[in-house]
Amino acid sequence: MTAFRSGLIALLATLALDQASKLWLYFGTDLVMTQPWRLAPFADFVVVWNRGVSYGLFQQEGGLGRWLLVAVSLAAVIGLSVWMRRAGSRLLAVALGLIVGGALGNAIDRAAYGAVFDFVHLHAGPWSWYVFNVADAAIVAGVVGLILDSLRPAPRAPSTDVAGNGGHPQA
């Protein structure tokens, strides 16, 4: 399987899991009326509509801000997809696929509802993490993959020594 195909599978799986989880939790359950749902002592399902970007930054109430964020997301998707198509390693392609799938999932929410549906809340005692969704988790995992790929040694280029002299000039 090519690196690109692996990245494409990661992209499509991320997008499908993200949208399915959001649609099921919002339209297929009574979470909106009965939240929070306690999953574990440190995790709940809740309903949060994020009108901003990561960590709730740049909250947008108006239509222009909403569509500007959709446009920026789609521009990033295009650029990262081109990079994924040219990726030289499976790790890089999968990392980019996770990021693109997550960005598309959140852009779909923003275009359809005016905000991103976040629902996973992790906490322990007084500590509380921001509320996120499958797309956000995939984006973070993709960034970790990008970092790991950047730390890998570059593959050595094959020797171009045709003359058999070890690459040294002739005397």
UniProtKB/Swiss-Prot annotation:
Record field: catalytic activity: Release of signal peptides from bacterial membrane prolipoproteins. Hydrolyzes -Xaa-Yaa-Zaa-|-(S,diacylglyceryl)Cys-, in which Xaa is hydrophobic (preferably Leu), and Yaa (Ala or Ser) and Zaa (Gly or Ala) have small, neutral side chains
Main location: membrane
Cell compartment(s), UniProt: Cell inner membrane
Record has Ligase as a keyword: no
Topological relation to the membrane, as annotated: Multi-pass membrane protein
InterPro entries xref list: Peptidase_A8 (IPR001872)
GO MF entries: aspartic-type endopeptidase activity
A GO CC term attached to the entry: plasma membrane
Record keywords, A-Z: Aspartyl protease, Cell inner membrane, Cell membrane, Hydrolase, Membrane, Protease, Transmembrane, Transmembrane helix
Transmembrane segments: 7-27, 64-84, 88-108, 128-148
Active site: 118, 136
Biological process terms in GO annotation: proteolysis
Matching PROSITE patterns: SPASE_II
Pfam families hit by this protein: Peptidase_A8
Enzyme Commission numbers on file: 3.4.23.36
Pathway of action: Protein modification; lipoprotein biosynthesis (signal peptide cleavage)
Origin superkingdom: Bacteria
Free-text function comment from the UniProt entry: This protein specifically catalyzes the removal of signal peptides from prolipoproteins.
PANTHER family recorded: LIPOPROTEIN SIGNAL PEPTIDASE (PTHR33695:SF1)
Alphabetical list of HAMAP family matching this protein: LspA (MF_00161)
Stated family: Belongs to the peptidase A8 family.
Protein name per Swiss-Prot or TrEMBL: Lipoprotein signal peptidase
Species for this entry: Methylorubrum extorquens (strain PA1)
